[in-house]
């Protein structure tokens, strides 16, 4: 069963807040901007992670230095999974943070 619009927005809002919390708690020098449902994480070296919601598809999209990725929410496992690789959003974020900032962060709770 697909997500309702309200459930989708609640999930994306919570996920974006959890991502912000991980970066805030890390002490890493990043700029966080959340505007109109788009979360942008700007790293010291100029690279970015951009999270946006695609309401018609009920997907969370991520733009990173290595490309663009689309995530569907898996209600059974309560996680976002990439629609092309099934890799979890949390795993990708851990990898991208190392690639773009040289720091390991734990996103397992998002």
From Swiss-Prot:
Please provide the record's keywords in A-Z order. Answer: Iron, Metal-binding
InterPro entries for the chain: CyaY (IPR047584), Frataxin/CyaY (IPR002908), Frataxin/CyaY_sf (IPR036524), Frataxin_CS (IPR020895)
Q: Which PROSITE patterns match?
A: FRATAXIN_1 (PS01344), FRATAXIN_2 (PS50810)
* Coiled-coil region list: none
What GO cellular component term, any one, is given? cytosol
What stretches pass through the bilayer?
none
A GO molecular-function annotation? ferrous iron binding
Q: Which SMART domains match?
A: Frataxin_Cyay
What are the BP-aspect GO terms? iron-sulfur cluster assembly
Q: Which Pfam families match?
A: Frataxin_Cyay
What SUPFAM superfamilies does UniProt report for this protein, alphabetically? Frataxin/Nqo15-like
Q: Which HAMAP family match?
A: CyaY
Which family is this protein grouped under?
Belongs to the frataxin family.
**Role according to the record:** Involved in iron-sulfur (Fe-S) cluster assembly. May act as a regulator of Fe-S biogenesis.
Q: What is this protein called?
A: Iron-sulfur cluster assembly protein CyaY
Which source organism does the UniProt entry give?
A: Pseudomonas syringae pv. syringae (strain B728a)
């Amino acid at each position: 069963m697909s997500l309702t619009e309200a459930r989708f927005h609640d999930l994306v809002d919570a996920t974006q807040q959890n991502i912000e919390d991980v970066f805030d708690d890390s002490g890493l020098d990043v700029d966080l901007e959340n505007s109109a449902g788009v979360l942008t994480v700007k790293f010291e070296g100029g690279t970015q992670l951009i999270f946006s919601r695609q309401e018609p598809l009920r997907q969370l999209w991520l733009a990173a230095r290595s490309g663009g990725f689309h995530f569907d929410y898996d209600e059974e496992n309560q996680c976002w999974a990439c629609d092309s690789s099934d890799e979890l959003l949390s795993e990708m974020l851990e990898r991208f943070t190392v690639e773009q900032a040289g720091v390991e962060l734990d996103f397992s709770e998002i």
